Amino acid sequence: MSRIGRQPISVPTGVEISLDGPKVTIKGPKGSLSHTVAEPIEVVREDGQLIVNRPNDERRSRALHGLTRTLVSNMVVGVTAGYSKTLEIVGVGYRVQARGSDLEFALGYSHPVPVKAPDGIRFEVQTPTRFVVHGIDKQQVGEVAAKIRGLRKPDPYKGKGVRYQGEVVRRKVGKTGK
């Protein structure tokens, strides 16, 4: 039995859960998320907790057991607390500006780079070189943060670019002069 999959998911007060066949919908103070559970796996409610079960020990069932439990657990955390990812911009003249609900980056290109906020995502600019991506869907928050980081990845020689807060960039030694 999967170590992760066998753990029950505790449901805090103020969170509504509806189990409609393979579809799990979770509503909380921050919003609503739904997920369709893969075929052999089933989600059951017992004593104010959610239990993820698998019918057999086939390879696919074992793989999906822990995955499904983690996805449903992330949904519960998302609708109660939410998720956020902080990014930093390093480099002379590199900065970010809020334009309504969207962001506009100056990243050393000849033009500003606009980034629109997808549904369910909110941006917060703390300083011109630091901003936060907020949302209730962990996967979507990470994906948007990764796309923004990909606009100008950290340079291995000078370290310039967009990076996650606390990310350590491996630096390379430049070539030596004559």
From Swiss-Prot:
Any one GO MF annotation of this record: rRNA binding
GO biological process, one term: cytoplasmic translation
Highest taxon in the source lineage: Bacteria
Assigned keywords, A-Z: Ribonucleoprotein, Ribosomal protein, RNA-binding, rRNA-binding
Signal sequence bounds: none
NCBIfam families, per the entry: L6_bact (TIGR03654)
Function summary: This protein binds to the 23S rRNA, and is important in its secondary structure. It is located near the subunit interface in the base of the L7/L12 stalk, and near the tRNA binding site of the peptidyltransferase center.
Quaternary state and interactors: Part of the 50S ribosomal subunit.
Family to which this protein belongs: Belongs to the universal ribosomal protein uL6 family.
Name under which the protein is recorded: Large ribosomal subunit protein uL6
Species: Parafrankia sp. (strain EAN1pec)
